[in-house]
A protein has these predicted regions:
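Conserved ABC ATPase signature
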Residues: 126-130, 134
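Conserved structural motif at the start of ABC-family nucleotide-binding domains
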Residues: 2-4, 17
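Short beta-strand immediately N-terminal to the Walker A/P-loop
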Residues: 30-31, 80
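Short coil-to-helix segment of the ABC ATPase nucleotide-binding domain corresponding to the Q-loop/switch region
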Residues: 90-98, 123
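The feature captures the beta-strand-to-loop junction immediately N-terminal to the Walker
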Residues: 33-35
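Helix-to-loop junction immediately C-terminal to a conserved catalytic motif
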Residues: 48
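Conserved ABC transporter NBD signature motif
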Residues: 56-64, 76, 106-114
């Protein structure tokens, strides 16, 4: 379970997130929606430790995340594919996905393909062949 409780994050002196809270239960799929500048990316960056919130708490499976290093958070299974399509262009879609799956993960490729059937259809294509929405 992921819990974000009243986080406040800044870019220098600019107070970008003001009291954001959310809970994601196991098995839930959550989407952050909002206009440009609403704080969607900053919320994700705060959860992943890219930005350290100045106030509030973030917990993943009961463990506090605020103050942990980015790689420590990633080892727990939290990651972000950046807006600039940070994938390996010459690897296939499936190879890109397999990089993200840990050996100890309960997730299997069929689980991912079940959620994103279009990726299964394109699994042998090079990563650079995907459209932005894929």
């Amino acid at each position: 379970m992921l819990t974000v409780d009243n986080i406040h994050s800044y870019y220098d002196k600019s107070h970008v997130l003001e009291g954001v809270s959310l809970t994601v239960n196991p098995g839930e799929l959550v989407t952050l929606l909002g206009r440009n500048g609403a704080g969607k990316t900053t919320t994700l960056r705060s959860i992943l430790g890219i930005i350290c919130p100045r106030q509030g708490q973030i917990h993943f499976n009961g463990q506090p995340l605020v103050g942990q290093k980015i790689f420590e958070i990633a080892r727990q299974g939290l990651a972000l594919v950046p807006e600039n399509r940070g994938i390996f262009r010459l690897l296939t879609v499936e190879e890109n996905l397999r990089i993200a799956v840990r050996k100890t993960s309960r997730w299997q490729m069929e689980d991912v393909y079940g959620m994103f059937p279009r990726l299964k259809e394109r699994r042998k294509n090079a990563g650079h062949a995907l459209s932005g929405g894929e």
